[in-house]
């Protein structure tokens, strides 16, 4: 799972990340004459308030994408178009101030060998709040029933003013599911969020 915003990153750490990792990377690309337009996703490890780069991806992360994009108020197509046309500075990107929490449901055994074609019962009975989302990742539908066919299967996302409320919303949905072949982590968002509480 994932959550946003991260309370791990404060202003000081953000400056370190920009000055030690992001800006030098962008300068190096420019010096090499490498024109790049798109996502640059930095996978970081933070040790003693120092950032270390683990990897770069030229795509959004999963489930980071599902967690962050629901907070975006600006039309995503307009952002992509501005990026392609090299005029990102001309558009204003607006975000809402909600807290976002994503819990990923996985097939038993994942990330190793996992069960497939296990029915996920009661999924069609879940009624989402207006600021909550359900993204399918590893499911198929057969005759009105849903079955798991992947490792990461479902993503429940909730936007709220408080992380605790977002967790409560997601837990409400999870309690309705009857899926013997699935599991999820219950500690997402607990470590760095003072307003989050145990289930």
Can you annotate each of these PLM segments?
Residues 1-61, 65:
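Internal nucleotide-binding/catalytic subdomain
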Residues 192-197:
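Conserved small/polar residues in nucleotide/adenosyl-binding loops
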Residues 172-186:
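Short arginine-rich
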Residues 73-81, 100-114:
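C-terminal catalytic subdomain
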Residues 160-175:
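Short, well-ordered alpha-helical segments
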Residues 105-144:
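Glycine-rich active-site loop/lid that clamps phosphate-bearing ligands
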Residues 2-6, 104, 152-160:
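Short, well-ordered beta-strand elements within core beta-sheets of diverse protein domains
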